[in-house]
């Protein structure tokens, strides 16, 4: 299986399926159909089957999928069989919220270091974490085998911070700054621009009024 041939939308839905399946498992449900999954996450049964077919054959026709088995498969496909350590640069309001975001831990992600270059923030604590100076980034990345970093700084600082993070050895960045980053091709970057998501909502609402 070559990951590059898998549509990113499929990976996104796979994560949603995995989360839904874990909720079913907590309720004691042992078997689920593609129709059940589709209804639970808001897609068609055909879409569920198509997404899963990228990765092999799952389930039994007429019976459905074993919930625990499908959870195990999706977790493995998403690379979540082992926990992932993260670092974050930016100890402002957004960074503080992300540190305490419970879903990270529930999904196997652990923030092991928070950094800032603002002297008024360095040394302070966010939840149970002390904010460290950027000079400590490389050390923490190496000590905790960190491959993924989160950028939670203003857009004017994002490119410089991204360069520092890549130099420290990070291979993938989740960027919350509303700016496109110029980085080497082998660095994975995903941008999260909340204003864009809001503009999609306003577009759809405006469309309804026409």
UniProtKB/Swiss-Prot annotation:
GO molecular function: any one?
A: DNA binding
Keywords attached to this Swiss-Prot or TrEMBL record, sorted alphabetically, are: Cytoplasm, DNA-binding, NAD, Repressor, Transcription, Transcription regulation
Q: By its UniProt entry, which InterPro entries does this protein fall under?
A: CoA-bd, NAD(P)-bd_dom_sf, Rex_DNA-bd_C_dom, Tscrpt_rep_Rex, WH-like_DNA-bd_sf, WH_DNA-bd_sf
Q: Which GO terms describe its cellular component?
A: cytoplasm
Origin superkingdom: Bacteria
**DNA-binding region, residues:** 16-55
What is a biological process (GO) this protein takes part in? negative regulation of DNA-templated transcription
- Per UniProt, what is one Pfam family of this protein? CoA_binding
User: Where along this sequence does the record place binding of NAD(+)?
Assistant: 90-95
Q: Give compartment(s).
A: Cytoplasm
Role, per record: Modulates transcription in response to changes in cellular NADH/NAD(+) redox state.
Q: Which HAMAP family match?
A: Rex
Q: Which family does it belong to?
A: Belongs to the transcriptional regulatory Rex family.
Which NCBIfam families does the annotation name? Answer: PRK05472.1-3, PRK05472.2-1, PRK05472.2-2, PRK05472.2-3, PRK05472.2-4, PRK05472.2-5
Self-association or partners: how does it assemble? Homodimer.
Q: What is this protein called?
A: Redox-sensing transcriptional repressor Rex
Tell me the gene name: rex
